[in-house]
Amino acid sequence: MSVDSTYRTGTRGTAGALVEEFAAAPDAGVREAYRRLVEAVWDGGTLTGLALPAAPEIVDGLDRADDDRAGLLAVLLGLLAEAEAYVPDSPVRAAVRRGMDRYLDRLDRCGSDEPLAQGLIYLLAHFPEDRDRILTQVSRLELPADDLSRLDRCLRELDPADPDLGRVWPAPSVWRLTDEEKAFDRAWIASLSPEQITVNWRNDTRNVWAYMGAKAYWTVRDGVPAAIPRVPHPADTGATVPPAAEAGPELLRPHAAAFRCPACHDRLDFGADDAGGVRCERCAVTYPVTRGILDLTEGISDAAAGTGDEASANLLRKLAEMPTMGLYYEALMRPEFLRVAGSNWDSAVTPASEDAYISSHVRPVDGPVLDLAAGAGRWTGVIAQAVGSERLVALDMGLPMLSTLRGKLPEVPAVRASALALPFEDASLGAVVCWNALQAFPDDAGTAIAEVGRCLRPGGTFTLMTFVWDTDPVYRHFQAAHSFPGRPAGMLLFEAEQLRTWLAEAGMVVREESGSGTFVFITAERAA
């Protein structure tokens, strides 16, 4: 029996039959029965015609189910409520909410470390109108601070007079900002229209739901996630970002032969004046170099002569914006991102295993080695150990990240430029690494890979780590529901075959491919 249009538009009896089929399935068949139930009522975030008659049946089924199956049903009820979270008078959401007494009663019989608790907390997070009641009940569980702060945030209503936007993922509790950072947030929030504030608030909420849902779904299927090794919080250690080391064009000059103007693709002149910028004669433009960062997005034309100092000062101001972002990312955000995007809740992939892969697979031929989308430099340091810092150039579009990188690795020059139009000559690079970054520009990933193929010398390696979609539609939804500043419509990952096709079209041959969960590690080589 298949889930077809009869099920999707059927009666409450049909819905009840599907719930009973799930309840009666042998342990080995639970996941398949759950898949059939999910597909009958929900399709990638959209409700089917069977959702309304099915909702009360699923609520009843949760009452009767053992803890393992009840956890799965709680996640499904959360998905049903979420699908119409902002639809006025949604009948499906109302039908799910009518089970509130039963959810709270079931939660009262759970321990905070039991998988069912995660499923119920995700479900309850969709009903801010019951905030006080839910939080009172949950207080007995003594949830970890991160879990509690996520639930608290989802149960809050937007206060248009004092909107608290951003800084909610992976949990509001991890964001402990300085006064300067709070002022920075207030300034950008004040520039938003009421409509933009509402959109941002809802996106923040969806991000937290997506994290909670991914964690709950993993937990009810596979058990309690492995603990992330905790590093001291930047706010507790008093850690500061070392200032990017002072350096001018001299740091980049050893690689001058490989560089090209991003506008006209002509050679760049790195000059003999270490205090100057980098010049394109054909475009009559000078690009500023400040603290070892060449900014190829901010050219100053000869017609604007005299503004070079102003451009450098502007770059310095940008470097000062949210200077601790790199620290937050490496210490607190990246491990959680790997959980969601890579299904790494079991910590199968560790920093040590990533280090080992890079060290053993980056095999450069002659020419500079590019760390593409280098971020805050955690893996730039690993590449430097593998190939030598004197060969390395780090490229990214994020100035706060590059500033952190330069503070940690003063011997490595940095370039602010686009991955979609690499500022390098054809066949000039010895190797390229793009680690945990290709998904940051998913719509243009094929273009970025083509650029890598253009710039690599024959025999040079392209080593990358990124993520593919989960084959389970529920977990795939939680991956996609994450929206970040560069991708407000939601996270976009890849299919493995898509990556292989792009690499082949760029003239590269895959030499190794591996990865647990939804990770993919690939090393390709530029063909002759």
Please give the residue ranges for each predicted region.
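N-terminal auxiliary segments of SAM/dcSAM-dependent transferases
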Residues: 160, 168-321
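Conserved class I S-adenosyl-L-methionine
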Residues: 297-363, 463-490
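Class I SAM-dependent methyltransferase SAM/SAH-binding core
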Residues: 368-421
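A short acidic, Gly/Pro-enriched loop at the edge of an enzyme's catalytic core
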Residues: 420-432
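A short SAM/SAH-binding and catalytic strip from SAM-dependent methyltransferases
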Residues: 430-444
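A short glycine-rich, Lys/Arg-flanked "PGG" loop and its adjoining helix->strand segment in the class I
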Residues: 446-458
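Short alpha-helix
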Residues: 490-506
